[in-house]
Amino acid sequence: MSAKTEAQKDNTMKDAGITQGAGTTDPVIAQVLKHFEAGDPAIMGLIAADIDFRIDHYKDDADIAWQSATDIEGFAQVLTRLGQEVFPQGTQILAADTQDLGNGWFLTRFEQRFFYARSAAMAESVTFITTHQEDGKMDFFREVVTTVTEI
């Protein structure tokens, strides 16, 4: 049995458009993104009870005050509202590149395509997500939506 090369490790999640930095194992954020894309409620099993969650938008006038949570119940409410108000037709992952920053911290560049309910049009977005995981659960999530472009 041969060890995987670094290039093979980087491509372990290519089926979901997710790549990782060299030398990493599957981070929780990669699993969370796959479940999010699939609309799979198993996503909740990857979230810590005391999750610190927030989505920010760069130069966007959208009301995002509700896009934060400090516990798993609040996260479930945000996730439900995202599904209803932002992603009513789901989302498609175009790319996700995750880098292991050490000590449970990860940085992900995330690209997705979705029907954006706010503008009633197909859109693509690029975001940067900083996460922390401990004991197989994500306990910190900060997403900065840098662009939402109608296509």
Question: Model-derived features: where do they sit?
Answer:
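A solvent-exposed, acidic/Ser-Thr-rich amphipathic alpha-helical stretch
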Residues: A49-A96, L101
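A beta-strand edge to alpha-helix "cap/lid" segment located at domain peripheries
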Residues: K4-Q20, G83-I151
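Short, low-complexity N-terminal intrinsically disordered segments enriched in polar/charged residues
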Residues: S2-A49
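A generic structural signal for ordered alpha-helices
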Residues: K14, Q20-A22, I29, F53, ...
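Charged/polar, solvent-exposed surface patches and flexible loops
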Residues: K34, G45, Q77, R81, ...
